[in-house]
Amino acid sequence: MTNGLPKHERLKGRHWFGVLFEQGRSIKRFPLKLVHTPVPEASQNLFGVSVPKRNVPAAVRRNRIKRQIREAYRLNKSIAEAHEFGALFFIYQGRESLPYTRIEQLVKELLLSYNNSIKKKNVVDEI
């Protein structure tokens, strides 16, 4: 598996955002929130990131936070690809920028929690 984040792995289109916010579940580790939903027909996870303008008004800071979250996900996406694929959408809810090491730690925690929730769901489905 490569460490890239190709275009076909990016979350795009109204359909997926509608499904995510209607049926998706969320995991929170302030200031990051992960909204996820399973996508049975997917061959890899679909990924998206958002930093609201209301929380971070300066575009330069918003873009930097988005780049940091994308990079942390790109390097750690193998954690989330262990069981089944889904749509993953990260939302930055803080008002202040964090160092990259903290963002990477939060992304790892969220991906591990996502993995655990998928495992629990699969165990319940088998019973």
Q: Where in this protein do the model-derived segments appear?
A:
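Positively charged, solvent-exposed patches that mediate nucleic-acid binding
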Residues: 1-127
